[in-house]
Amino acid sequence: MSDYNLVGVIKVMPTDPDVNLDELEEKLKAVIPEKYGLAKVEREPIAFGLVALKFYVLGRDEEGYSFDEVADIFRQVENVESAEVETVSRI
């Protein structure tokens, strides 16, 4: 984890409240490119039973690293309504 100097928080909204979040989380973890790390995943209740997944993705402040790239990959996964980079911070 010490090789990373940035953390990007990516908020993923499932298509509906009935989506199995455990399965969706595992699918999303599997598509994160190898050069990135993952610090943690949190669940954030939104409304009407809908829960967002917040991925804390680790990267470096250098060319070739883009949290938008990871969000774009997440959007391609089945049962993902949206994936947006909320914040990027130095660590």
From Swiss-Prot:
It comes from the Archaea. The keyword Acyltransferase does not apply. SMART domains: EF1_GNE (SM00888). Keywords: Elongation factor, Protein biosynthesis. The keyword Protein biosynthesis applies. Pfam families: EF1_GNE (PF00736). GO terms for molecular function: translation elongation factor activity. PANTHER family: ELONGATION FACTOR 1-BETA (PTHR39647:SF1). Belongs to the EF-1-beta/EF-1-delta family. Promotes the exchange of GDP for GTP in EF-1-alpha/GDP, thus allowing the regeneration of EF-1-alpha/GTP that could then be used to form the ternary complex EF-1-alpha/GTP/AAtRNA. This is Elongation factor 1-beta. It comes from Thermococcus kodakarensis (strain ATCC BAA-918 / JCM 12380 / KOD1).
